[in-house]
Amino acid sequence: EAIDERKPSFLKNVTVRRKLNGGNEAHVFMDVPVGTSVGDLIERTGGIDGEYGEITMGGAFTGHATTLDAPITKTTGAILVSMPFMDLKGAKLGILVCACGGNLERMEDLAKKYNGTVTQVCYCKQAQEQKNGSRKCERPGICPGQVKNNLDFKKAGCEYILIGNCSDCSNTVMASGPKMGLKVLHMTDHLMRAVGHPLYRTLRVSKEVDQDLNVQDNVENN
């Protein structure tokens, strides 16, 4: 449309889902004017079902927290309403920043909502900082071990660690973290729980062969 009709981008197709009255099925709204409030779209679905944790604009991995009066923009594709956050009661928490998921600011925001005390911050060694401040994975899909980072979390006295890794990379966290007594949280947990989706922890199928990857088989709740 931008090329053929010389039409500016002022309409968006937006999906609203998760902790809503009437169930967690996806509600897709077509040709929504940019500037429409988040709250207006949520009300069109029937409203939020009781208590909730946060409203996220964007996807579970790279989205950000928003408010009911915030406007949708030309880059908005989804609005997600999460389950309430579990209360860590001030427990010491470590943050592992990966290029796959949220940046440090987003992870610290989630840690605050979990009521955890951030004690240690580590970065995946392949999440290299770029000139604009973002991070880019040097070798996507070929994940390094996270034993060193897990040891640093343990030495810092962390009870929990909050990760943002993809399902492949979370394997490397789960291979050693729980054995050290570290309790693993993923930055998407509050959103996955809202739709009954298994939590991202361990990839259970091989990446080496072609297969029909059923999400239910790829992750585990622990």
Task: Walk through the language-model features, giving the residues of each.
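Cofactor-cradling patches in redox/metallo enzymes
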Residues: 109, 119-211
